[in-house]
Amino acid sequence: MRISFFHPPLEANRQQAAFIEVLQKAWEANQTTLADDQKYDLLHILGRPSHEVVEKIRCAKKKRIPILYSPLSEIAPWSEKHINHSLAKQLFIHTTGEAEYDYIKKRYSDANVILIKNPAVTVDTTQTLFNSELQQLYQQILKQHDEQVKADIDTSITKLKTPIDDEIMHAVLKGFLYLHYKYGRRQILQQDMDAQSQLMLTADYDEDKLGTILKELKLYRFVSGLETVMEKKSQLTEGFMPIPATNGRLTKHINSATL
């Protein structure tokens, strides 16, 4: 798993520094990679909800990146800064104590709030247990986020000007839309390309109609470039491509986004 980690300057915040050490031990134990590029699975943000933190969250949400936010007791009744409700409900908020959990859960009732205790400040947990719980949380976030992305794609397909009654065409289009989302994340996985190729090799649908829909969605150029990448890296062949493949600059960008 690859994550991006962000926190405000430590300054004299010993609690934050100690918790970062706990996180680092967990990442090492779980073989979690800290990414220094745009190819990561999840963004983990730590610390008080400063302007910089809020902007980081907003930017990630625009890119549809799953976010885990650990305020580390910096959101409390006496705090001057908070996250607005519309933003909070799109986050997974990690609390480290029962009082913090109860307050956050009450304040942001629509948010995903999780309690995983911090072994740096309590004997109620251990580093080993924390490692396991953090890994499970990361996996839960990725699973829920991916399910939501696919559900949103299904909804967008039902709103097309050109209606799709064919379940097979719906599935093929959904696969292209999902790969386009992953392209935006710079994270096109081999297994996802293989699944799309296999579907296209066995599917029977109106290719001309799909081409029209791809133009409606402004996905025509992307799919034509993607087909070239899929032909080279997956089992797709020309006879099963719904539109002509191209090999231009966009194709190179798509290829560089594959993992």
PLM features: what roles do these ranges have?
Residues 1-45:
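N-terminal pre-catalytic "stem/leader" segment of glycosyltransferase-like enzymes
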Residues 14-15, 122-136:
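A charged, aromatic-enriched C-terminal amphipathic alpha-helix characteristic of glycosyltransferases
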Residues 42-47, 58-77, 94:
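Active-site proximal beta-strand in glycosyltransferases
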Residues 78-91:
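A conserved, positively charged/aromatic
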Residues 133-259:
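Conserved NTP-donor binding/palm subdomain of two-metal-ion nucleotidyltransferases/polymerases, i.e.
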